[in-house]
Amino acid sequence: MASWLYECLCEAELAQYYPHFTALGLQKIDELAKVTMKDYSRLGVHDMNDRKRLFQLIKIIKIMQEEDKALGIPEHPLQASSLYTKPREFRSGPRRQLHFDSPSASKDKMANNETGSLSNFSVDEQKSTYLKVLEHMLPDDSQCQTKIRAPDASAADASMQTETNAPLFSSNYFSPQLGNCDIPVIQRVSHVSGYNYGIPHSCVRQITSENPWTEMEKIRVCVRKRPLGVREVRRGEVNVITVEDKETLLVHEKKEAVDLTQYILQHVFYFDEVFGEACSNQDVYLKTAHPLIQHIFNGGSATCFAYGQTGAGKTYTMIGTHQNPGLYALAAKDIFRQLKVSQSRRNLFVWISFYEIYCGQLYDLLNRRKRLFAREDSKHVVQIAGLRELQVDSVELLLQVILKGSKERSTGATGVNADSSRSHAIIQIQIKDSAKRTFGRISFIDLAGSERAADARDSDRQTKMEGAEINQSLLALKECIRALDQEHTHTPFRQSKLTQVLKDSFIGNAKTCMIANISPSHIATEHTLNTLRYADRVKELKKGVKCCASATSQNQTSANASPKRIQSSPVTLPGDKCSPKKVKLGLQQSLTVAPGPTKVKAHPLASHVPNVPFTSGPKTPGKKSSSRGSPTPEWDMKASPRKGTTRSGHSIKKGAESAPLCSEKSQIGSKIAVGWEGRASDPGEGLLRVRLPTRGKKVQPVQPVQKQLLSRPRLLANSHHLEATQDSKVGTPAGLAPEAWTNPILQQKEREEHLRFYHQQFQQPPLLKQKLNYQPLQRLLCQHRPSEGRLQSETGFPLHSNPENRDGAQAEDLDDSDFSEDSFSHGSSQPAMKQGSTALERSGSSFFLHQDREHSPEEQAAERQQCLLFSSETDGSKKRPADSWVYSRDPIISHRRGALSQSHSPSMVCPDWSKEEDSASSGPSPKDNRAQKPSSSQVDFVHHQKPGEAQVSDIRLEAFTSEVPEQAEGSLSSPSPENGLSFPLSHVAVSGSPDQRDRVCTPLREVSENRVTHTPGRVNSSTPFQEDSGEQIQMCSANASGLMAPLTMSLLETPCHEDLSSLEQIAQDGAGYGFMAEIVGGPAAGHTVPSYDQEAALPVSSATECLWLSSSPPDNRPSGDLPALSPSPIHQHSPDKLPGREAYQTRRPILLPENHMGSKLYDDRAEETELGGSLTFPRKPSSNIHAGVPYSTPFLTSCTGSSNGVGRPWAQERKHPTGVSCQELVSSTDSNKPHYNEDIAWLRHRPISRCLDSDSPVVPSCSSKALRTYCPLTPEQAQQVIIRAHKEQLDEMAELDLKEETLMTQMDSNDFEDFVTQLDEIMALKSRCIQSLRSQLQLYLTSHRPAAAPERTVVS
């Protein structure tokens, strides 16, 4: 055999190695066949060519041996004479298999080798020869780059020893059946940091330390290898994963070269921790999640999530089994143990929540898969809205909760796993104190398994969607990790719900541990490599976090602040710029407002006249209203551009962050800015100045108005200032040169006209357009105009306003009202305020101007022209004469109304009228302006109305005032707030008819003249606005504005009361609706406004009309009721005034056209819907809200929370002798034009005296005959109203029943108190709903039981 060996070597030109072979014990050819590439260096074969020849020789010998086997020649077992290799037994299988022996096994075998002489080979020589062999075997394979890791010195020996001692190759690794296949070459590839992911980083191992990893690292990446399953072993799957040590992992990937040569690509990965199949969940927990527990007890947050392919062991790791609990259970035990051990932590409790993310949606697994929503709080921390949290006091209970949730989780069969998790499950364990304040939080996330679409078997559409969503979310997670690793300014956390929920796991004071789970099967090699590469990417992030920790920490605006979040932080340093998020109407967001009151940068709109200055008030963007705490002087005469800017930017609302936006907005609405400035300026001084600038800024009214809160005391103190402020609102700061605002620029006018026209068309529903017929109203207005003119002459209000200012303000108002109505409908309260303020400013400002110094004929004419233009543009069909008349009245009415609006609709004004209100309020008192708009329906409806509507409102007010001059004056003039308010209210209630409105306006104006500041406030509220009206109005406006559409809101908000309680009371009584309007000059005025506005403003906004319409019926009813209900001046009005009101009422039918009525009713419903939200407030919405709400809708009543008919004043009125209510209800309920007409007629008919009369709640003085005469409602209509109300009540009750059932199903013993609270709320709503329906039924019965039922029906 030796000769044969020598001959073979000679044939292969390797004869020179024969002596060395024999010296090492190679005597036979069969023994030579056992030589592996690893033995070449030991055999002395170092030359690459010789090695090739030796390899070919061995290959031929093996082929011959296999041929002998095939011929049946018995194979003599080879002795392990070769020191290099020892035959290994391998399991045969149906397919080619890869058998890899672990390095430790190789070492053991080598140790048992007969020859130990090879140990004298130096390690260096072995390494060099080994590398040469690899290079020789695959010299041209660019894919196989042999990257030998240069381990630390401490690990060099062991690592190298492993590589050299383990047989590099063994034929046993490959199927012996493939005799003619070349022996594969193993290529080792080390995946160091940066490998295949971009720029390589130096791979520096962290020196092991006894300290927990949480003290040194932000993210820890571990890998866990599961063992082969029984089924996998049965199928013959091979383990291709080798865990070399606790940080190193090898993956043996079988590959095939282009020439069909098979080779093994050995991937080497390094991680913070590698767990083999022998590791238990306890072992994994101690190295991963255990250090996180101490971190959360230190006040931090922690996340531990498992990632990997379907079936890799993620769920087992995180949730585990009853015998081998998962990480969350082990963590819970640790938490409870620490809570018991530490005395200082005895007052802490453990809360658990469990939800999943399935197909991009969140579901609560502890609450019957209730749909959840992920939102960010003010600190940009993600909160899960609606998530059910359970308090657990033991690990057993916690395990039961998790078990319950696990049963609800979405799972499904896939091609890889029969029970695969198809959703991401998040178990959140929180530590809270007795006040339920979160002390620490740890989340365990079991991610859904990633998979390839090619692996899916028999997948239907749902399965494909699941897989796509899972992969998309995991990809988004990878993108977030990449962005964080590369320190991008933007991290796409919102690309998926998963990343949104996990956002806090990667930023801020959060520690994260990722456990990559892998399967050992060779079939899953590709999945395993993808998982390991993914984890390696996170490991790089971990390293990057250390480097950029300072960058992350430097943004400490919040505990969890990302660079992006920090950049967008709402807090702006003085002088810092904050670009608005939105640019409105092409306005440039060039205006930057610094917190400092004086520091402001303003860039005029392209359309804005450059000469119009922006002023900043002392108010800082961060403050809601600098005037709030500051004395009036702060606002005095300060033409601070900033104020206007701030207001525009809604700085009051949003604070410093909004300041930038405010700047932009203020640019957009310089008029608004001016209004704010006016407010800022002393109410008395700045009125004129502010108004003047307002003209110049009217282009900017397009911008939404920001609310400014003024202290109620200041408002009360400076009622007059309030009015002046309103005017000043309209105008620019007193400090600004009036000439800049004196001459409106053509561009501004065109802009205003365009915006007005656009908003009118945009906001008017086709129904309203068809029904609008303002001719009659205009005629009425014209008829009443004389009285208004008289009133004007009589009531020279000491308002400081320039006709120019007024004009500017008017134009501005028009634009603002239009724009605010259209685009700044925030509850329409802001727009309404803006409109109202503009309208008020316009009419009010001009009115103030007139009052200040009675407008010269020229000024009045100019104002009228503006008003007419606006009205005509807005109303279209309206007659110019009426408009002009209205406007001519407007100055007075405006002033009154402006003052009234300010005082009585502070809330409304505050939100939407913020500039007006702020100016007024700022002068008098910032807090008066709180966010609530005055309830004044006039103001509100004006705001919501287009500028035309505002004019109409003004006209109505003026008409009402002029018509009821004596009464109004009497009541208004009376110093008592009640008188002032009550009279206007009654007039307002009556204001449904232009005459009535005029009357009210006149008295109000006169009163205002007598006590401009006080009367308007009183008019706005029963008591002077300064006293209670501000708060009430604010509340009302807040409710109305938030809940209603811009127009509807304004109408609803318009009604303002001196006292919310009084308003609520009135609403409860059923008079509240009308009462509010009346008090504010709203329901009635608002209602009246509907009539007027229907003529003048209907074109502007059907919604506004609707509000008015709804207000007027309720107003009528409430008006009657109001006197009885509240101590408001309306009630106080003596019956003698009632006749006058009745007269006004008679006029009202004329004022309100049927079309208007119908449209109002239509809008009213819409309003009601909106109001419904506001009405829902536990406290009854201000009557103005009620007024805005359709009285016929039961929902409103219940929502309003005033079952008495607050929601449905008309119902209450029905209860009262007033015959109006039933018919009103029908008309309001009916969307048909006839019904509206009837309602309008009723409104016209309804006796103002009722509203004004304080003696009788329903003012019986209004005869049912008169009501019937004016607005007869047929019994059929009344029945229809009742039927409809009953149906609505049934629907609402059904909805409440459903809520109650849902609440019962969700009842939890741990939260029984909360359950009782919610149940009580539901019962209260039911009670209100029932009471509302009963009110309507009683009203119907009172109207139809008497013999004179027809009359009452008509009235109703």
UniProtKB/Swiss-Prot annotation:
GO molecular function: ATP binding; identical protein binding; microtubule binding; microtubule motor activity
Domain Kinesin motor: 218-541
Biased composition range(s): Basic residues: 640-653
One of the Pfam families matching this protein, by short name: Kinesin
Record-listed Phosphoserine modification sites: 102, 473, 579, 616, 640, 817, 820, 1008
SMART domains xrefs: KISc
Modified residue annotations for Phosphothreonine: 615
Stored PROSITE patterns: KINESIN_MOTOR_1, KINESIN_MOTOR_2, SAM_DOMAIN
GO biological processes: cilium assembly; microtubule depolymerization; microtubule-based movement; negative regulation of cilium assembly
Subunit (UniProt): Interacts with CCP110, CEP97, TALPID3. Interacts with MPHOSPH9.
Protein name, as recorded: Kinesin-like protein KIF24
Gene this protein is translated from: Kif24
